[in-house]
Amino acid sequence: MRHYEVVFIVHPDQSEQVPAMVERYQSLVTGQNGAVHRLEDWGRRQLAYPIQKLVKAHYVCMNIECNQATLDELEHSFRYNDAVLRHLVIKTKKAPVGASIMMKSVEREEARKASAEAAAVQAE
């Protein structure tokens, strides 16, 4: 089986449906003897360019190990899901270890917001 990094962008109005979508895609991969090595929800982020007149969307990254038939079925489900604006599948040499660079920046951003809120509460 081969390793892949899958990133998909979900319509911002469907953000509350993301956990169910991720669960469905995980079960699709694991149900056919695949494995999900890393799953990261990057949250709602600014798009590089407008897609369908939207400037923000919900990003999800999955690192999986599966066969070609499973990957084809996963891409088919992305293509026919109207909530998925874009998706990208990249073949990788091995399973990743640790958090991705994007996830680290998301965590730094959240920590900065939390410290700013704590400072605002202490100032009052």
Swiss-Prot record:
Record's function text: Binds together with bS18 to 16S ribosomal RNA.
Gene Ontology annotations of biological process type: translation
A GO term from the CC aspect: cytosolic small ribosomal subunit
The organism of origin for this protein: Bordetella avium (strain 197N)
HAMAP family given in the database record: Ribosomal_bS6 (MF_00360)
Keywords of this entry: Ribonucleoprotein, Ribosomal protein, RNA-binding, rRNA-binding
Record-linked SUPFAM superfamilies: Ribosomal protein S6
Domain of life of the native organism: Bacteria
Gene name of the record: rpsF
Annotated GO MF terms: small ribosomal subunit rRNA binding; structural constituent of ribosome
Family: Belongs to the bacterial ribosomal protein bS6 family.
Protein name, entry field: Small ribosomal subunit protein bS6
